[in-house]
A protein has these predicted regions:
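Long, solvent-exposed extracytoplasmic domains/loops
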Residues: 52-118
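Polytopic alpha-helical membrane proteins, predominantly small-molecule transporters/carriers
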Residues: 58, 128, 162-163
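Transmembrane signal-anchor/signal-peptide helices with a preference for the extracytoplasmic
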Residues: 32-55
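N-terminal acidic, proline/glycine-rich, low-complexity intrinsically disordered segments
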Residues: 1-7
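Short, aromatic-rich amphipathic segments at membrane interfaces
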Residues: 111-134, 143-148
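Juxtamembrane interface at the cytosolic side of transmembrane helices
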Residues: 7, 13-16, 20, 138-180
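Terminal, low-complexity, charged helical segments
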Residues: 16, 29, 34, 83, ...
């Protein structure tokens, strides 16, 4: 004769959920911590690259002003037929335009500033994904806490599903595998 399974009491169900939830909440919290760490690093990189790019553009503008002044001096030297000064100014103007030896010509500065901006823009793309991921992890933790209090397996599985979405969003934030 088959024994009828008695339904679990509330305290037995609560113990069962607490056993599972303890491990799950630890994993979700660890993922949330990693997500926050990466997000903060990305925020710092965006800020640093913005500052560096702005500094480089300011240096570029200073070189442009100096080049304009050198061009005016060149015109004056040509008008006064001072060939020595004219040659000196031509060399200076060429160095302001491009100076590969020091990397401080306008051409090199523009390339450096654009590279910094491109890196900043690439890192900035991950920001929303990491934010949404963090929100999903937090919601997963809240649902898991509610599952423990309500002794509800559907809430438990719902928290796992929401956290899985958080992991998917975090992977998009890290690798940008979807071209959105």
């Amino acid at each position: 004769m088959a024994e009828d399974k008695k339904p679990l009491s509330r305290s037995e169900r609560e113990a069962k959920i607490k056993d599972k939830a303890g491990w799950v909440i630890t994993v979700i919290a660890a993922l949330l911590a990693v997500n926050t760490y990466i997000s903060n690093g990305n925020s710092s990189k965006v800020l640093n690259n913005t500052i560096k790019a702005n500094d480089t553009w300011a240096f570029y503008q200073a070189k442009s002003i100096k080049q304009t002044l050198a061009e005016q001096s060149l015109d004056d030297a040509i008008a006064r037929k001072d060939t020595a000064k004219a040659e000196k100014m031509k060399a200076k103007i060429e160095r302001y335009e491009s100076d590969p030896a020091t990397g401080e010509g306008k051409k090199e500065l523009m390339a450096k500033a654009r590279a910094l901006e491109a890196e900043r823009d690439q890192v900035r793309k991950s920001g929303p994904w990491m934010t949404f991921s963090g929100m999903a992890y937090q919601l997963g933790i809240v649902l898991l806490s509610a599952a423990i209090l309500a002794v509800s397996m559907p809430l438990f599985w719902g928290s796992i599903a929401v956290s899985a979405v958080g992991a998917l969003l975090m992977s998009q934030g890290i690798w940008l595998w979807l071209p959105i």
